[in-house]
Amino acid sequence: ITENQLENLVEQKLKDTYDVKGIERPTYKGDIPEGNNGLGLMLLGLTGDKVLPADVYEEIKERALNSVRGTVQADILKEDQAQNTCIFSTEFSLRLMGDLQSYFIDHKINNFYSVSISGYHIAEAGANPISQLAFTLSNGFTYVEYYLSRGMDINDFAKNLSFFFSNGVDPEYAVIGRVARRIWAKAMKLKYGADERAQKLKYHIQTSGRSLHAQEISFNDIRTTLQALYAIYDNCNSLHTNAYDEAITTPTEESVRRAMAIQLIINHELGLAKNENPTQGSFIIEELTDLVEEAVMLEFDRITERGGVLGAMETGYQRGKIQDESLYYETLKHTGELPLIGVNTFLSDDGSPTVLPKEVIRATEAEKEFQINTLKQLNEVNSHLIEDGLKKLQEAAIANKNLFHELMEVGKYCSLGQITHALFEVGGQYRRNM
């Protein structure tokens, strides 16, 4: 737009779309973040295809899709097993994931992960490190089998898969990444004949929120630091360190800065961290790696005996195991068999009472009203497009066409709620097995 001096055309489109109809233009609230020039705000309330010639827009779109980086989390199996934020039927959700991956392959979207196969939520729900790793990897292999059944090539999609694990303080967490990589690489190479890039498992670590306690909350930074060292020494690809007050409230500016400082101090001040994978070759790390791998393979056998991941889900196997392990941990915590400093042992003179938050960050009434008005504007401006767009989306679902292609279009003028309810009618809502 700037190269071809089309700013006046954009302004005219905004006038026709909003001013003439008496609708307030959407605005960006707040200061522009440092390092951003705000150029993208030029099209706030419009899409590029309303301004640019169709061929130019398509060329720019393809170029953007080829270079854009990011991650879609959308891992439906862990939702059923642990996270509980399922809205569509499992079958329809898998289909949406397959359509997304197929779209990525067709449009050569190589730098965006199509799914973050997540163990973090499984661990936070109560699973021990072995179950977290076994369930997560088995979910990953289930996606692989499903995508292969749809005719996709392993080398086209395996590079778009990433993983997400939790790190606690148990010794198994010290090797969770290297065990995952070992099992994944073996399977990709020996079972699926995948190329070298597909054999490389990329994973993100977030330190364990479940390991943070509402008593003596300043001690939580120590726990997070130790978990961060586990992750870094295990060669994670990326790392998130939790704020110490997340046990009682949404993080504050001060606690977030401290959480970031944990990583910065390790990276810039800790000498050993300058050496990649410093613990490799030690007896305990090698022994742990073999033991954890063996334990994960045994859990794979138990899942296989129950008909694979989907078969095990039908009887609630994963959920039941997670609940049992959660109860076991809580029992050890409350009896004191598992010593937790400042929680059940080494208490302060006043008994280390539960800390109550000084502030709880919530959306203000003004922020809520702003969002409501934004949605109203969206519906008013696009009232002539919404019904036809949603109908076309439903027809694509019934005709077994690629739904992500349609979502890329209908997402320009329909709200998330409108799209969701339209898909409920053709894909079914989630119902948990009892």
Residue ranges of model-derived segments:
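Context-gated lysine
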Residues: 13-15, 21, 29, 50, ...
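Active-site capping/gating regions of soluble enzymes
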Residues: 98, 134-143, 162-342
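Conserved helix-loop functional segments at active or binding sites
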Residues: 103-110, 146-154, 186-194, 227, ...
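Flexible, glycine-rich loop/tail regions that form catalytic "lids" or insertion modules at the edges
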Residues: 261-264, 268-434
